[in-house]
Structure formats: structure tokens, C-alpha cells
Amino acid sequence: MHYADAPYRHDLADGSAEWSCHWITADDGTKLRVCNWTQATPRGTVFVFQGRTEYIEKYGRIAQMLVQCGWNVLAIDWRGQGYSERPEHDPMQGYVEHFAQYQKDIDALIDYAKSIDLPKPWNMVGHSMGGCIGLRALHRRGNEFDHATFSAPMWGIEFG
């Protein structure tokens, strides 16, 4: 399957590992940006699930380190973040109607990873909000991931 190329801001990213960025579409039509870093003989793939207001380039250095350790890396800009599609009413605002919409992003990401034959084992690293999204993905599609690691995960929000 062919995917349209998506932008990558070298000036914002630390790390020079070989990468490619593409546009994918969630089943509700939301356009999402994904990037993957690859190397010749991968041990598997690490999925990076970033936190709120973060963007793919922020993880360039981590991606480079993981590639140097033998892993391919796949990252996504969640809907409303980075270059992924934002709500029409305020394109500068990251917004979802329901937190469960992020699972549509996960579904599209997994479909993409399978379509480009990213090698297993598949490992997830979830930071902050990405940890919450990742934990829910494990409940829904846990058989897709072999391992998960969480960094300062957002397990919930306390009000008041």
C-alpha cells in the first residue's frame, strides 16, 4: 500500500536515524501523521505513544537511541496534536469529543504497522497521556503488543 509523505521538522528533532513520515487515516476520516525510524536488522519495533501537547519530533533523540540499540521505532501525532488533523472550530486547539477517539488512532496505527511489515516483537512505550491511551489499547488489542513500558503515565485525572 502507498502512503502519502508527511512533513518532518529536522530543526525540532534531535537524532539523525533514517526515518520516513506518512499520512494515515482513522476510520472516522481523521488524518494522522506517523513516522518510523528503521535500521537494517531490527530486533523488533517500539511504538512511542507521546503525552498531551507533544509531537513526533520531540522523540527524535529517543528514536535514534532505540535504532542504535537495534529497534525500529514508530510514533504518531495523536489527533489534535503535532501535524495531525485538528478540529475545525479552532485549529490551534487539541480537542477530542471523547477520549475513546484516540483508540481509532491506535487502530489506524496498527493497521499501518502491519501494512508496512514492521517486525515483531512489538513493544509500547507510553508517556503521560500516551500511557493512558496505551493502557486502554492493551485492554482492547493487547494481543498486538508483546511488552509495554510506561513513563509518568496519566492513569486518571482528579478534579477538585
What are these regions (language model features)?
Residues 1-25, 30-37:
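An N-terminal hydrophobic leader/cap segment in hydrolases
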Residues 52-64:
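The serine-hydrolase catalytic nucleophile loop
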Residues 117-128:
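Alpha/beta-hydrolase fold nucleophile elbow
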Residues 129-160:
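Alpha/beta-hydrolase-fold enzymes
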